[in-house]
């Protein structure tokens, strides 16, 4: 096989609740790509200021002063209804969209969680493109194993909006297993992947042998993750403060954001320390003056606060083992820990206890292993990784509502995918000429208790007594775990098909519009970036010219000196005026550059006379401005013409 060009490469993306990561296969090895800040993971945080949109570390840094417009953990909201948001606590506003889905409001604008995910993916895409020096179009994106069909489609939509062709959706524990087991030889092994991340918990049982990775069973909880551990500490902090001062901080977004950051920091510290001090000065005030939050949190107290959360991970483990037909935990060869929360000693110990004292594997980086697995899957699809077969499963049963509101599964959970299955149904009433097919996903006996994925109608059925018409319903699940459902009347041949849409509240037209908006804004974003680079170069020119003026000003004529000082003043005033266009800044920049050549000549003469060398001259600032500045990662929200700035 020939060399894969950058545009043909398939990157692997772990779109996480707390952090995201991107990797790629190079020379048969998966490599994690660092972002522009030099980090191997990027915070899944998006912030909206008055003039710009920030993503990643820049967004996270300003959260304390912009809490209501800083969006984090949006992955926990994807595919969820507004009335199902009781467990999600955040300082930003969540509101019901027209269709009842949970959306997010920032700076007065409504955003689907799908859009927020797309903004994070854009940043990840830029990280990969900076590394390759070429456009990147294709990606494998991971999702929690227990994500339902609509959430998977929503994730794929986010990739589309970000300008990516999502060639495969892969379950996070399965990706981790790929990363763990790729170089483990041909020996048959049964492994468990215990994945406790920022927003979700998954557990998968896999058999690995001779390059075949077969998922035997999966289970989980999409409402359990590190965010819940943070919330437990936050509640403890706020309750302690209330008891001490009588002040309730729950309705103070800025205080809540500060407490959240402190809680997360304390949680991380307690993985390696027995106690930590939490101090937040000036957290609030009353008639007596400023109030400070200060308390000591021990590891034992923290473990007590979250013991119920840790215990909630055990029941899914039991169900996964039962579904896989494993009655004895000694049959498990390896337990692989994934997700940042698995660094917590109490979590490690509870997993060890449940699996019969088996020490969990610590040979993988829990923050990077999922992205590495996604990159390996990308390598499989390109042919860069050979002799590997991945067999995943449907995490939840899929079926339709039948007479009496009963849920009738067509595809049972843990069925290997891709798969296709048909079943014949009939009418419930005499003379019925149309049927409504309601598609559900879940494990409850009554349809209403499961997740409604979508519905469609099949009309034009020939009138006949009830039970006579034969309507064939077919479920087709592709390798991404995304469902297509069709219904066909065998007598008339009439057929209706539905592809389950995401629960992100976005129609295909809206998604297309967002994609177009992103493309249209690319030129504007580039202008904004060039403007910032130009301003940075101008500031550097002013600084170096003033230094040279101080060193060599007495060696040029007073007229030249006055001219340079005037040019510096004009450029500085231009930079301080937000309405100055890039063209005007460039003109003032060029004018000062030209005048500063006199200083360069004076410096050269001084060096020649003294026989020494120096590089602190104004002429040192010449050249391409792009080569002297660091890229600033943000996007302009306002769509004003650049010249008006």
Curated annotation (Swiss-Prot):
Function: Acts as a chaperone.
InterPro entries for this protein: ATPase_NBD, Chaperone_DnaK, Heat_shock_70_CS, HSP70_C_sf, HSP70_peptide-bd_sf, Hsp_70_fam
Organism superkingdom: Bacteria
Biased composition (Low complexity): 609-623
GO terms for MF: ATP binding; ATP-dependent protein folding chaperone; unfolded protein binding
Membership in a protein family: Belongs to the heat shock protein 70 family.
Region named Disordered: 603-645
Protein's name according to its UniProt entry: Chaperone protein DnaK
Name of the gene this protein is made from: dnaK
Keyword Chaperone among record annotations: yes
């Amino acid at each position: 096989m020939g060399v894969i060009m950058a545009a043909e490469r398939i990157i692997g993306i772990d779109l996480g609740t707390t952090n995201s990561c991107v990797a790629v296969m190079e020379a048969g090895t998966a490599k994690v790509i660092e972002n522009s800040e030099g980090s191997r993971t990027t915070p899944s945080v998006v912030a909206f200021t008055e003039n710009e949109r920030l993503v990643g570390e820049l967004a996270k840094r300003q959260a304390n002063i912009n809490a209501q417009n800083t969006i984090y953990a949006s992955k926990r909201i994807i595919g969820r209804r507004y009335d199902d948001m009781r467990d999600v606590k955040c300082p930003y506003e969540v509101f019901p969209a027209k269709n009842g889905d949970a959306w997010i409001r920032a700076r007065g604008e409504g955003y689907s969680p799908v859009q927020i995910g797309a903004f994070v993916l854009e940043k990840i895409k830029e990280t990969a493109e900076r590394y390759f020096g070429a456009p990147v179009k294709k990606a494998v994106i991971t999702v929690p194993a227990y994500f339902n069909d609509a959430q998977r489609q929503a994730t794929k939509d986010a990739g589309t909006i970000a300008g990516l062709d999502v060639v495969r959706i892969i379950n996070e524990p399965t990706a981790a297993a790929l990363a763990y087991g790729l170089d483990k030889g041909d020996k048959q092994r049964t492994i468990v992947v215990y994945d406790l991340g920022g927003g979700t918990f998954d557990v998968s049982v896999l058999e690995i042998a001779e390059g075949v990775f077969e998922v035997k069973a999966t289970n989980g909880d999409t409402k359990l993750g590190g965010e819940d551990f943070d919330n437990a500490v936050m509640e403890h902090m706020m309750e302690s403060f209330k008891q001490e001062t009588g002040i309730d901080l729950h309705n103070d977004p800025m205080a809540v954001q500060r407490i959240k950051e402190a809680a997360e920091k304390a949680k991380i510290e307690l993985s390696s320390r027995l106690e930590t001090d939490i101090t937040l000065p000036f957290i609030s005030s009353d008639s007596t003056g400023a109030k400070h939050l200060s308390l000591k949190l021990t590891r034992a107290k923290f473990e007590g606060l979250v013991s119920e959360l840790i215990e909630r991970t055990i029941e899914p483990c039991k169900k996964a083992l039962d579904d896989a037909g494993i009655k004895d935990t000694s049959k498990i060869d390896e337990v692989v820990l994934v997700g940042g929360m698995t660094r917590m000693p109490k979590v490690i110990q509870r997993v060890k206890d449940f699996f019969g004292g088996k020490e969990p594997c610590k040979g993988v980086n829990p923050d990077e292993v999922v992205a590495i697995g996604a990159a390996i899957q990308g390598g499989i699809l390109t042919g860069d990784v050979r002799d590997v077969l991945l067999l995943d499963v449907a995490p939840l049963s899929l079926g339709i509502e039948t007479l009496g509101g009963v849920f009738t599964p067509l595809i049972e959970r843990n069925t290997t995918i891709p798969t296709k299955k048909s079943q014949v149904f009939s009418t419930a009433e005499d003379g019925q000429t149309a049927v409504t097919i309601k598609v559900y996903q879940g494990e409850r006996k009554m349809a209403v208790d499961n997740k409604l994925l979508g519905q469609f109608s099949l009309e034009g059925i020939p009138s006949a007594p009830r039970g006579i018409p034969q309507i064939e319903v077919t479920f087709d699940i592709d390798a991404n775990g995304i469902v297509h459902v069709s219904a066909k009347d065998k007598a008339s041949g009439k057929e209706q098909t539905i592809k389950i849409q995401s629960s992100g509240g976005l129609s295909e037209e809206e998604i297309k519009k967002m994609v177009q908006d992103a493309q249209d804004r690319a030129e504007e974003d580039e202008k904004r970036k060039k403007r910032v680079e130009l301003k940075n170069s101008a500031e550097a020119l002013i600084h170096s010219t003033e230094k040279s003026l101080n060193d060599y000003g007495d060696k040029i004529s007073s007229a030249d000196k006055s001219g340079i000082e005037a040019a510096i003043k004009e450029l500085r005033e231009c930079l301080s005026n937000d309405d100055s266009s890039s063209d005007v800044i460039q003109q003032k920049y060029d004018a000062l550059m030209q005048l500063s050549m006199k200083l360069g000549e004076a410096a050269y003469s001084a060096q020649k006379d003294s026989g020494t060398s120096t590089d602190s001259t104004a002429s040192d600032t010449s050249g391409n401005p792009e080569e002297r500045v660091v890229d600033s990662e943000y996007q302009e929200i306002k769509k004003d013409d650049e010249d008006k700035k």
